[in-house]
């Protein structure tokens, strides 16, 4: 029997989604409690592995298990009871067709990146937003962001550890909204390269600060060293996954 689950979590304090030998991970916490509740070894398969410090509001994973006396809503309640101190919350579980795959059935992934643009440091939103103290040119950010939308070779916008066979991706959306001192980047695509969203944000901030050339020039270079810094993980949220 295959289950589809939606989970939210605060990435601070975790080594990321993926299970690690010597550091806590979201995957390990979920597999441990699900295995305990369902009385069998559970392995979860995720839509997209988030890095250390990255958060999720709508991460999706699937797992297989024998038929259980527990109903899906009971599994949700039990998991949340056991993980109440971990800042991991299971939002929903449902039984799905066995052809469903959290990663390969996905047609679009949506991310948000949050910046707090003010001079004073953060307290409440520390580790939930990137604090940028310098004044940013919002119009320039929005203008340059649109040059990233569409199908491009994003070689300049992936980390050196990226394992993808090529850097060609289609970015469906990259929009920026501002509400007071908060700036939110909305990015959507079927798939992203490793650190792509964070490098795009870091590059746009560098351009808006007058430190870098234009996005079109950076794309044409096809070299990571021409793009801006990788924005810190604390501002990135996996918002939802479409199927």
Curated annotation (Swiss-Prot):
Provide a Gene Ontology MF annotation, just one.
RNA binding
Read off the InterPro entries from this record.
PsdUridine_synth_cat_dom_sf, PsdUridine_synth_TruA, PsdUridine_synth_TruA_a/b_dom, PsdUridine_synth_TruA_C, TruA/RsuA/RluB/E/F_N
Instruction: State the Gene Ontology BP annotations.
Output: tRNA pseudouridine synthesis
Q: Which residues form a coiled coil?
A: none
Q: Which UniProt keywords apply?
A: Isomerase, tRNA processing
- Chain positions recorded as substrate binding sites: 111
Q: What is its EC number?
A: 5.4.99.12
Residue numbers annotated as active site: 51 (nucleophile)
**What SUPFAM superfamilies has UniProt attached to this entry?**
Pseudouridine synthase
List the Pfam families.
Answer: PseudoU_synth_1
- Please name the top-level EC class of this enzyme: isomerase
The residue ranges crossing the membrane are none
Q: Note whether Isomerase occurs among the keywords.
A: yes
The chemistry this enzyme catalyses reads: uridine(38/39/40) in tRNA = pseudouridine(38/39/40) in tRNA
What NCBIfam families is this protein classified in? Answer: hisT_truA
Say what the protein does. Formation of pseudouridine at positions 38, 39 and 40 in the anticodon stem and loop of transfer RNAs.
Q: Which family does it belong to?
A: Belongs to the tRNA pseudouridine synthase TruA family.
- Could you describe the subunit structure of this protein? Homodimer.
Report the PANTHER family cross-referenced here. PSEUDOURIDYLATE SYNTHASE, TRNA PSEUDOURIDINE SYNTHASE-LIKE 1
Protein name (Swiss-Prot/TrEMBL)? tRNA pseudouridine synthase A
The species this protein belongs to is Neorickettsia sennetsu (strain ATCC VR-367 / Miyayama)
Organism ancestry:
Bacteria, Pseudomonadati, Pseudomonadota, Alphaproteobacteria, Rickettsiales
